[in-house]
Structures are given as C-alpha cells and as structure tokens.
C-alpha cells in the first residue's frame, strides 16, 4: 500500500501524455488507445495496470467532485478528475499490481455528498487499461462508450407538501418539454392531477393545481411522454416532506409487540402502505413464515399510519417480520420497534419482558448522586472488560455477565458510573469484534455479549442482571447511544421498509446526506423519527433501569430534539446523566458547544482536550504531549468552561 500511495504522488506531479482531440458530442474516445501503464514509469515505480474513470454531470458542475478508490480489501485514496474530454471529465488511476477488483465512490469534497450511495466495483485487466463511463446519479456504468445514454431521466420524485412535487432530473427541461410531463393516480392512470406550474432546473418543482389528500399521498406516479423523451418509464412519486404533517404523526400511540400468555398485540407505523402483513416464524433460522396475518389500520381521529393486529396464544420468543406493500412493491424487514431479535438481526422476536427479570431487578435501587460534578465515569467495552480476566468463567468472558465478575476492579479505580460502549443490536457476525456504532435495532440488546447468542432472550436477562449487579455495588450505568444514523438505510431495512425516505435526511434529489460520516443521517426533525428516539430512551430507562445516556454525535441532532430528550428523560429520572459530542461526522452542526446552555445536558469540551493533548491530526502538540498547549483553555476547562461556552459547570464534561 505504501508503493500504491507513492505512485499516487508521482501521478499527481506527472503530466498526462495525451493528445486532446476534438470529437462530436456522441463520440467518446478511449484513453486506452493512447495510454499504457508503461507511460507512468518514473522514479523506479511501475504501474502494472490503469483504471480510467470518465464522469459526466449534465449540469457540468465538476468542481470539488473526486473519486475515492481502493483495491478490494485494501486502503483507499482520493483522485481528482483532472482531464477533460467530450463526455465530461476523467481520471487515470494507477496500480503497481493488479487486484482482482477495485472499488470506487464518486464524492463531493471530503464526503460532503456521494454521487451514488453504494460501493461499485470494477474488474481490472492485468497489465492493461480498464476504462469505464459513469453518469452522475446512476448506479450502472459501462465499459463501452457506444452504450452511453445521456437522455433525460428522472432520478427521483418526491411529494414534499400536499401541492408540491420535487423532481430530480438529469438535466433541466428544454423549452416545451414541461408540457410532456404528467402526474397520474397509480390506482387509475387515466386520472390526471393537473400541474399548475413548473419551476425548471436540475431540481425542478412542480406545483399541482390542488392539494393531495392524506389518503392519496402514496398513490402518485410521474409520466414522461414517450414522443418527447423517448423510452421513458413511469416514476414513483414518494411521499417525503408531506409526511411531516400532523396528519401522519400519531405521537400518542405505543408501538411494538406487547406479549402476554394469552395474546400479543402488534402495532407498527407505515403511512404509505396499502397492506401490512405480519410474518411469524417457527424459529430464528426458519426461512419461510408459518403464518401470515394482515394488520388492520388503527388510525386515530384525523391521523394516519398506525397498523395493528392481536394474535391469540402465547407467542413469547416467536420470531417475526413485517411485509409492507407500498408504491406497488412489497418490502420485508424486522420490526424497527422490536424489543428482541435473533443473532443476525434478520428477525424480530416477540418477548414478554416481565418473564425475563433476573433476581433483584425489581428491588435493587439505582444509586443516587448528590452532585453531577462529582460523577466519575469509566468507559468500557463489554467484550474487552472481561475477555482476559482469568478468574471469570470461560463461558462468561466478553459478556454482560463477565462484567459482574470483576466489579471490585471498578471500585479500585474510584469511579461512580460505568459508561458502556454501545450495547444496542448492531451489525456484526457472532463472535466478531465490533465497537457497536453500527446500530440495527435500537431497543434490542446486542446478542454478541450474551452467553448464548442463539437465544434471543439471553441478552435481555443478562444485560438486566449486569445492571442489577452494578447498582448493588453502588455504580451507575450510562448507555452510549447512536441515534444519529443506522446500519442500513435500504428499502428492506427496518427504517426503510415502513416509509421510504422518511427516517433519513436526503438532498432535494433524494440522495442520503452524510452528516454522520457513515452514509446516512437520521432525520430527527421529523415527528415520528423524534418520537422513535424519545420512546427508545424511555424503554431503556423503564425496562433496564439505566441511569443516563451518552449521545454519539449529538451535533447531528436538532435542538428541538435535544430539548425533548431532556424533558422526557428528566421526567422519568430527574437525576439522569446526559451528555454528548457537540460535533458531527462531517455534516452541519445543529447542536454545538453553547447550544446546551440552560439545559440539563453536558457536551464534551474539545477546547480542553486539544489544549492538553494536541489536535486530532497531530499537527500541533498540547500541554501533555510537548512544549506548548493553550494554558488559558486548560484553566477555562477546569472551571467548567463558564467563561467559554457554558452557563453552568454541569453543562460540560471533561
């Protein structure tokens, strides 16, 4: 990889040995006809193979767009589109040796935006030049320039209020083309909704002649006239911003699967579905459901989106999924509101939480703390804490129960609270190490830390038992929570299947934003997304008796959400510990340092951190790492940042 990076540096300094030729718009010459890997031999480095990526943006706005490219299984690097041709721009990427496949992503800036959300891969020709043509926003690419199609296409269509459709197209409309666009009812394509005006552009806005009723928001299609646009297909108009209205926000409804010995009540939310089906499975490994039950609409007066079903009999520990049929397509996924799941998170599991209470769960009080400024937190990873602790039984090492075997060590450290790195259900194979910041189901404890990951109830019992043991030892428990993104945002994910595009922030054209640096951002400004976070926090407080929360990338969350969190949590636990990171993974900061003033929540003080240890990229040293350091920042931090960004010392954490 060092040779790969060195060759990149050589390439950036080396002028391309190309002769630019003029060509007709439809004539896209191959760089491979004029370029060979041997042309890049310099300073003892030899490129065995080359990848040429041609890139076309209909709007011709190429500034700051670049390629992130990596050999499959290896490290990545950035490359610029530094050459022009009739297609647009292109980059030449050298490889000292030829990997079987190379992955690439086209991005804007330093992950400000992705051109296409998924990784794409190219098989390289050993000892030769591999050349592909990529059009902005399209997942498919071609190695044959004769197959390039630059005709107008719809990238996305979204109903953002009852009368406005946001339309993302590959180029602005030309004069007269607006008359060839129609909005139709999916159930009756002869029923047309008249377009009043079109605000033209790469992102066009269609104003309809009338409001779309709440019952019809997921029934629209957009049709481009074939005579004008050629072989154009109908496009689904997804309900997006329109779903933020109160008509689609049953905020008082309790969602999830609630089990007793007599029956289980299933309640879920999908304001765009025509049909919601419950799929019950015999066991977590079963591939086909044993029963399929249609849910009924359970809408409150004036509100839509709730679905429910009551199934008789004792379903405790029975796996299930939902099938949501919307926009003419079925989408299956685990229940986003579930309280248990199988080991690989592919199935939700019904549980009666009252049957999974360990000894002492109901009568072990949570430790109180006299002053928040006296709290001393110790951050631990469940697996790491006991994995090499020899007195712990082998079967319990790396588990929730393993923590209970060495509580004396925590007392020796003098800490008052344990901060658990994420224990919510995350995407990882059984036994695979993971930090936990890739959450799948937020109300489910991770089975990897249970003594029996194959038993969906084991993680619940054992996490509760661990918390009881820590409380009995006068230690509080704080959960690290990661509500700023999810492990999957696809159409068959827990948050994608019920309401596509609702739970995630998107650009006007429908691409996921990357506020968190992980490829998606949870849209907590939307009522039901905010409700999900609040209900989830209440679940952990009431069902696990935790004592507080540490919010990963708190800066991604809207101030209204943070205020609602403080209100909900403090109502249940007035002494709860709340703190978080006042920054993001690269997106705009919504809740930064200073936003917490007057609220019962603290934020990390990176001013103090950097003054002591230096900055994150190692370009500057701090007080503890070399000569220097901002002594004033250290003094302000020790004083609780009251002369910096806080109103009270309790609003910062060091």
Predicted segments with their positions:
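Substrate-binding/active-site clefts of carbohydrate-active enzymes
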Residues: 381-544, 554, 561-573, 577, ...
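Acidic, low-complexity Ser/Thr/Gly/Pro-rich repeat segments typical of extracellular/periplasmic
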Residues: 164, 170, 174-231
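Short, surface-exposed loop motifs enriched in S/T, G, D/E and P with embedded aromatic residues
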Residues: 76-85, 189-200, 289-305, 309
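Short, surface-exposed alpha-helix to beta-strand junction/turn motifs within ectodomains of secreted
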Residues: 63-73, 166-194, 274-292
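Conserved alpha/beta catalytic core and glycan-binding cleft of carbohydrate-active enzymes
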Residues: 343-344, 348-355, 566-654
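Short edge beta-strand/loop segments characteristic of extracellular beta-sandwich folds
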Residues: 52-58, 66-68, 164-172, 264-271
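Bacterial N-terminal signal peptides
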Residues: 8-19
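The feature marks proteins involved in alpha-glucan
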Residues: 25-59, 85-161, 209-261, 288-290, ...
């Amino acid at each position: 990889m060092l040779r790969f990076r060195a060759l990149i540096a050589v390439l950036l300094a080396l002028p391309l040995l190309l002769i630019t030729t003029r060509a007709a718009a439809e004539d896209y010459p191959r760089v491979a006809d004029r370029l060979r890997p041997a042309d890049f031999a310099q300073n003892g480095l030899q490129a065995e193979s080359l990848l040429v990526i041609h890139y076309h943006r209909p709007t011709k706005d190429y500034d700051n767009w670049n390629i992130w490219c990596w050999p499959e299984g290896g490290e990545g690097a950035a490359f610029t589109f530094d050459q022009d041709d009739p297609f647009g721009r292109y980059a030449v990427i050298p490889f000292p040796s030829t990997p079987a496949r190379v992955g690439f992503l086209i991005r804007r800036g330093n992950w400000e935006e992705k051109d296409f959300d998924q990784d794409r891969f190219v098989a390289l020709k050993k000892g030769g030049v591999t050349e592909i043509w990529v059009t902005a926003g399209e997942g498919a690419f071609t190695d044959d320039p004769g197959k390039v199609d630059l005709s107008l296409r719809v990238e996305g269509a979204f109903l953002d209020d009852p009368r406005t459709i946001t339309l993302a197209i590959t180029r602005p409309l030309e004069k007269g083309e607006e008359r060839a666009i129609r909005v139709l009812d999916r159930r009756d394509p002869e029923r047309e909704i008249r377009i009043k005006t079109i605000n033209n552009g790469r992102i066009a806005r269609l104003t309809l002649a009338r409001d779309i009723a709440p019952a019809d928001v997921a029934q629209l299609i957009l049709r481009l006239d074939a005579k004008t646009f050629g072989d154009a297909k109908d496009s689904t108009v997804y309900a997006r911003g329109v779903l933020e209205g109160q008509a689609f926000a049953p905020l008082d409804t309790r969602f999830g699967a609630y089990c007793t010995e007599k029956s289980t009540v299933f309640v879920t939310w999908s304001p765009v579905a025509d049909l919601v089906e419950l799929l019950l499975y015999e066991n977590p490994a079963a591939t086909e459901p044993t029963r399929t039950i249609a849910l009924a609409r359970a809408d409150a007066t004036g509100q839509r989106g709730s679905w429910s079903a009551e199934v008789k009999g004792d379903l405790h520990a029975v796996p299930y999924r939902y099938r949501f049929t919307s926009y003419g397509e079925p989408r299956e996924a685990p229940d986003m509101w579930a309280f248990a799941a199988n080991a690989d998170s592919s199935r939700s599991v019904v549980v009666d939480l009252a049957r999974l209470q360990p000894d002492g769960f109901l009568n072990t009080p949570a430790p109180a703390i006299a002053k928040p400024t006296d709290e001393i937190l110790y951050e631990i990873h469940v697996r790491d804490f006991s994995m090499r602790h020899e007195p712990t039984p082998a079967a319990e090492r790396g588990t929730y129960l393993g923590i209970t075997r060495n509580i004396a060590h925590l007392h020796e450290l003098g800490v008052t609270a344990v901060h658990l790195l994420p224990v919510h259900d995350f995407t990882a194979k059984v036994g695979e190490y993971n930090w936990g910041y890739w959450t799948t189901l937020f109300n489910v404890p991770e089975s990897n830390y249970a003594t029996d990951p194959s038993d969906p109830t084991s993680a619940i019992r054992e996490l509760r038992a661990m918390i009881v043991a820590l409380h009995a030892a006068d230690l509080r428990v704080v959960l690290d929570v990661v509500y700023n993104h999810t492990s999957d945002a696809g159409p068959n994910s827990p948050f994608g299947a019920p309401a596509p595009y609702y739970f995630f922030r998107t650009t006007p054209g429908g691409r996921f934003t990357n506020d968190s640096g992980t490829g998606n951002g949870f849209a907590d400004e939307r009522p039901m997304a905010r409700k999900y976070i609040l209900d989830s926090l209440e679940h952990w407080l009431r069902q696990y008796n935790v004592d507080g929360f540490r919010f990963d990338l708190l800066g991604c969350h809207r101030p209204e959400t943070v205020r609602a969190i403080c209100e909900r949590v403090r109502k249940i636990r007035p002494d709860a510990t709340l703190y978080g990171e006042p920054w993001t993974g690269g997106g705009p900061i919504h809740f930064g340092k200073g936003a917490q003033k007057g609220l019962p929540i603290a934020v990390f003080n990176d001013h103090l951190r950097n003054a002591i240890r230096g900055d994150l990229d190692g370009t500057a040293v701090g007080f503890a790492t070399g000569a220097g350091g901002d002594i004033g920042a250290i003094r302000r931090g020790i004083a609780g940042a009251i002369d910096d960004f806080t109103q009270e010392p309790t609003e910062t954490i060091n």
